[in-house]
Design a protein with these regions (language model features):
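NUDIX/MutT-family hydrolases
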Residues: 72
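Short glycine/proline-enriched turn or capping motifs at secondary-structure junctions
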Residues: 79-86
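Short, flexible helix/strand-to-coil boundary loops that buttress conserved ligand/catalytic motifs
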Residues: 67, 76-79
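Short S/T/G/P-rich N-terminal loop/turn motif that feeds into the first structured element of a domain
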Residues: 1-50, 58-68, 84, 91-93
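Short, hydrophobic secondary-structure boundary micro-motifs
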Residues: 75-76, 91
């Protein structure tokens, strides 16, 4: 199993409330996506990111499919239009 974890900071935290449902809606649209969990930060510390996504895939090929899937690319394009910074980690478990 592969976990794909991404933390986003937008120029405006309100964007996280738009992005989370867009990411969650990818379930059922991207065949290799096994689960999608999103969360919005409530601590508002200066070092916090606004939101996190945790997605799971059966294998690296599934993650690769997700990365280039047209539905994911639409969401990614929007995220990049409002993004200040992000970090990600992909790991096998």
């Amino acid at each position: 199993m592969i976990k794909h974890v991404v933390c986003h900071r937008s120029r405006d935290k309100a964007e996280a409330y738009k992005i989370a449902p867009m990411l969650n809606a990818l379930m059922g649209k991207v065949p290799s996506l096994r689960s999608m969990e999103t969360g919005i930060d409530f601590m508002d510390s200066v070092r916090a990111y606004h939101m996190v996504l945790i997605a799971t895939f059966d294998d690296r090929a599934g993650l690769d499919e997700y990365a280039t899937h047209p539905e994911h690319m639409k969401v990614k394009e929007y995220i990049h239009s409002v993004l200040e910074s992000s970090v990600s980690v992909d790991f096998e478990c």
